[in-house]
Amino acid sequence: MQLMTTSEIYAVGVPIILMMIGLEVIFSVYKKRDLYSLGDTGGTLGLLTGNIFVSLSTQGLMLGLYFYLYQFRLITINDLFPPWLIILATFLTVDLVFYWYHRASHRVRFLWAIHMNHHSSTEMNFSVAFRQAWFGPLSKVPFFLCMPIIGFDPSITLVAGVCSTLWGVVGHTQWIDKLGWLDGIFNTPSTHRVHHGSNAEYIDRNYGNLLIVWDRVFGTYAKEESPVIFGLVDNVGTNNPVAITFHTWASIIRDVRRARSLYEVCGYIFGPPDWIPAIKPDSDAPLQSLTSLSIDQGSEFR
């Protein structure tokens, strides 16, 4: 089975993406929309630089791990199905695994500490797709280890992953309006704007990367209706990539240091970003609620 290499895919995809960004900038200036700002774009470039460095530093090890695990695969998918079905199955499985990785990155606090970097922009444009966390290349590895074990060829999985990543760029724009029935099947600009919204009705919605049907199946789908407010519920207030990267980690460390038990330590690290320990009914202290959270905790919420 002959597929394009990742280098060939990037050679085609990157110029197209750069052209899209250029056209969006022209559109922004012409329509006086202010879709881009120098500070926000600078923060994105700082985060992207760190992400690329970590990715290049670890990709050999990660690929080696995938191919090592492939030796112990449960089935050999390449021997069971025709090429077109292998490619289709790989793309669908990559997208499904990504859905759960993405969902976990919003609902597990230490993963959110990484992923919130991507949501730290209060803008929505094609360049925001490249606002990637420094530790992002590492956080997704455990989720995708299942693929070589099941029997998906790592070389095909890699190609599918690159294609899916490039498709994800398309969703980061205000330039393209709703697309009707396509919004209910694919991750379109409309559905992904919802995902980046800090509106209460949009929080933790639309995790899909290629297909949005996973969200419809697992109950996390939302249509774009009210105007989207981009960013975090409480924004970090800086474009410094170092400050953004360690913003939530700092609050996790503070919470862990004041934890009263191992249970609370685990809750602060592995629980949802808005997790707080319950107050015992017989305690003299008032019952805690989300409204009594510290500023440090609240500032990381979506």
For each of these PLM feature ranges, what is it?
Residues 2-17:
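Hydrophobic transmembrane alpha-helical segments in integral membrane proteins
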Residues 2-6, 35-40, 76-83, 117-118:
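Helix-boundary and loop/linker segments of multi-pass membrane transporters
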Residues 16-28, 91-96:
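Central hydrophobic cores of alpha-helical transmembrane segments in multi-pass inner-membrane proteins
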Residues 22-42:
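Membrane-interface helix-loop junction between the first two transmembrane segments
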Residues 49-61, 76, 81-232:
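Membrane-embedded catalytic scaffold of the fatty acid hydroxylase/desaturase
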Residues 68-78:
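Membrane-interface helix termini and inter-helical loops of multi-pass transporters
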Residues 228-302:
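Cytosolic-facing loops and C-terminal tails of multi-pass membrane proteins
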